[in-house]
Amino acid sequence: MIIPAIDLIDGQVVRLYQGDYDKQTTFDLSPLAQLKSYQDQGAKLLHIVDLTGAKDPNQRQIKLISELVAGLDVDIQVGGGIRSEQQVTELLAIGVKRVVIGSLAVKEPELVKSWLNKYGSDAICLALDVNINANGEKIVAVSGWQSAGGKTLESLVAEFERPGSKQTALKHALVTDISRDGTLTGANTALYTELAAAYPTILWQASGGIATLDDVSAVKDSKAAGIIIGKALLINQFTVEEAIQCWPNA
């Protein structure tokens, strides 16, 4: 599935290079008009990242997100700075389909597991943003990528993937190779192939580095369930319509 994405800072559409707030590109675009364009080209799910909220949860752009959700007809998933159940319920109440949880899944996995139980596996998506070190270990970053979480991707997934009898299993997870994010250097398809094979019950969303339609096809072949595309669409590398031709929506 093709999942067009926009990142927002203070109401503006932006892109960061490798998650670095000091390497920001701002686009002179209306967030709603851009998302509507993606919707009109056939996207069935849109991804919004509140980067202001990721950096400072007290500054979350909830009013803007509410306006965007109200102005669109397709499913929306939202991430960035989700730190409390109140924020989860707030997003679900305004019509967000799925809340994307990053840092908190590393810091307080039991809390996030309780949300899976309460709201269901379709309402929660884990965002696992990884730095892959020289030993090939996938270390999960936290707090808008401003610090390392200290856990490996595998150890974190194991906490959610092997639930007890009363635990709702994880269904959706988004994985970004930070070294590829915003770089247009191609996706880390080996990573997604490995994850899809190791954890076949999880619907993996691939993110980071998508530059060409060949990249889209390569991620499709990796058996990921979906692909997040941000910068490539903003700079007109290709269109949503063209991407969907490579990877028709299920």
Swiss-Prot record:
The active site is at D7, D129. It is found in: Cytoplasm. GO terms for molecular function: 1-(5-phosphoribosyl)-5-[(5-phosphoribosylamino)methylideneamino]imidazole-4-carboxamide isomerase activity. Its EC number is 5.3.1.16. It is an enzyme of class 5 (isomerase). Belongs to the HisA/HisF family. NCBIfam families: 1-(5-phosphoribosyl)-5-[(5-phosphoribosylamino)methylideneamino]imidazole-4-carboxamide isomerase (TIGR00007). This is 1-(5-phosphoribosyl)-5-[(5-phosphoribosylamino)methylideneamino] imidazole-4-carboxamide isomerase. The gene is hisA.
